[in-house]
């Protein structure tokens, strides 16, 4: 196993190797774009009943962990991670906040919907989605618990983080909890940090890339581990939620 690992690294650091693999995946995604577009539907046409403007009188809480992966990577929520999310959802004031997730309806983002149903928590859940989605994603977005969608001008799903910036981070304060992802989630965190709204950002440092991002943005983000009592910290930092 050590031999195979050393061969994989080929003189690179673990970080360099991971980023190199991501770059390959992103190139494959670009090459597959034409095929993906052929097999996609227009979001505005197929989901017109769901289109809405994001609320301005509530605090947006962005949960990242499912939609922010390059091709070939999937987010599998951990038991501890789901406990954190459940505890958080139990403690928020649904009159003061709403959730914003990505378009894939997977991982921790899907768990927001499932846990809200389980707890019968009447919280608004919206999604920011690209101009084109697959039939499978369209069907997931039709879930009755997703109140509305905001359509990004981006055709490519890896670029939707730009719309999170324009629609949320540049306009208002938000709370960002990044559970998982790779390069797209790093872009999201960076946009949240740069935005005029001065968002509060919490990142799961059990994810190696998010840990490195937290080190880079030390003082601007709060790193946590799934077994930490991070929910109390988030509530304490953001009494308005």
Task: Describe the function of each predicted region.
Residues 2-9:
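Extreme N-terminal basic, low-complexity initiation segments
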Residues 21-22:
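Amphipathic alpha-helical oligomerization/scaffolding segments
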Residues 34-50, 54-57, 64-226:
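Acidic/glycine-enriched connector segments
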Residues 9-12, 33:
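Intrinsically disordered, low-complexity regions enriched in serine, threonine, proline
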Residues 13, 17-18:
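Short, positively charged and aromatic/hydrophobic N-terminal segments
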Residues 217-241:
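C-terminal functional extensions of proteins
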């Amino acid at each position: 196993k050590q031999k195979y690992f050393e061969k994989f690294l080929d003189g690179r650091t673990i970080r360099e190797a991971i980023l190199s693999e991501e770059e390959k995946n992103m190139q494959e995604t670009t090459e597959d774009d034409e095929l993906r577009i052929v097999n996609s539907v227009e979001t505005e046409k197929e989901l017109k009943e769901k289109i809405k403007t994001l609320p301005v009188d509530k605090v947006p809480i962005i949960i990242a962990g499912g939609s922010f992966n390059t091709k070939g990577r999937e987010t599998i929520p951990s038991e501890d991670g789901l406990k954190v999310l459940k505890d958080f959802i139990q403690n928020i004031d649904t009159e003061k906040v709403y959730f914003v997730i990505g378009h894939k309806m997977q991982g921790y983002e899907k768990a927001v919907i499932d846990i809200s149903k389980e707890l019968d928590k009447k919280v608004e859940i919206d999604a920011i989605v690209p101009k084109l989605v697959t039939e499978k994603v369209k069907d997931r977005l039709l879930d009755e618990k997703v109140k509305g969608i905001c359509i990004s001008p981006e055709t490519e799903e890896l670029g939707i983080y730009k719309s999170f910036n324009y629609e949320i981070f540049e306009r208002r304060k938000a709370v960002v909890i990044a559970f998982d992802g790779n390069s797209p989630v790093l872009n999201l965190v960076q946009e949240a940090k740069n935005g005029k709204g001065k968002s509060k950002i919490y990142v799961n440092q059990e994810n190696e890339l998010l840990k490195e991002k937290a080190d880079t943005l030390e003082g601007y983000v709060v790193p946590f581990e799934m077994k930490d009592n991070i929910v109390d910290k988030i509530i304490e930092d953001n009494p308005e939620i």
